Design a protein with these regions (language model features):
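A short glycine-rich, Lys/Arg-flanked "PGG" loop and its adjoining helix->strand segment in the class I
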Residues: 60-72
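Class I SAM-dependent methyltransferase SAM/SAH-binding core
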Residues: 3-35
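A conserved beta-strand element that flanks and buttresses the S-adenosyl-L-methionine
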Residues: 46-47
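Conserved beta-strand signature within the Rossmann-like core of class I S-adenosyl-L-methionine
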Residues: 73-80
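Short, glycine-/aromatic-enriched active-site segment of Class I SAM-dependent methyltransferases
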Residues: 81-97
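A short His-aromatic
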Residues: 53-54
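Core SAM-dependent methyltransferase catalytic element
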Residues: 113-114, 122-138
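Short alpha-helix
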Residues: 98-113
Length: 138
């Protein structure tokens, strides 16, 4: 394994079951990412293909959650859309909501919550066209 320990949160019991099966040594919790109540900080926080399913206001509020759960000097990585907006996609034939703020607002939120942006790649071909943010807590 490339990590010492991992804690994962998802609101879907099915997704958590898949994680438990694949990585049985992980700490997997069914919870809402907006209020996970983990009561600990981590060296890295990743919200890959998850954060952008929250509406704009919830995304803004998430920066306090990210800050609460990131240890000093720790990293935060998440994916977003390439620009401000909302869209409805599909997953397994069901509609799936997506939203993103614009880059300037994300940068302001990072700064206001004590993070410095380390990298930002819009529609990264190496990541399947995802827009990726990486920041470090000051």
């Amino acid at each position: 394994m490339l990590f010492r320990s991992v804690t994962g949160v998802d609101s879907s019991p099915e997704m958590i079951a898949m994680c438990r099966e694949t990585f049985p040594d992980g700490d997997w919790r069914v919870a809402d990412m907006r209020s996970p109540s983990l009561e600990q900080q981590f060296g890295g926080v990743i919200a890959w293909d998850s954060f952008f399913h929250l509406n704009h206001d919830d995304q803004r509020r998430m920066f306090a959650v990210f800050r609460e759960h990131t240890a000093p000097g720790g990293a935060l990585m998440f994916t977003s859309g390439p620009a401000h907006g909302e869209a409805i996609g599909a997953f397994r034939g069901e509609p799936l909501y997506h939203a993103s703020l614009d880059g300037a607002e994300y940068r302001a939120l990072f700064d206001a919550h004590g993070f410095d942006v380390v990298a930002h790649v819009v529609e990264d071909p190496a990541c399947g066209g995802r827009t990726v943010w990486l920041a470090k807590l000051r």
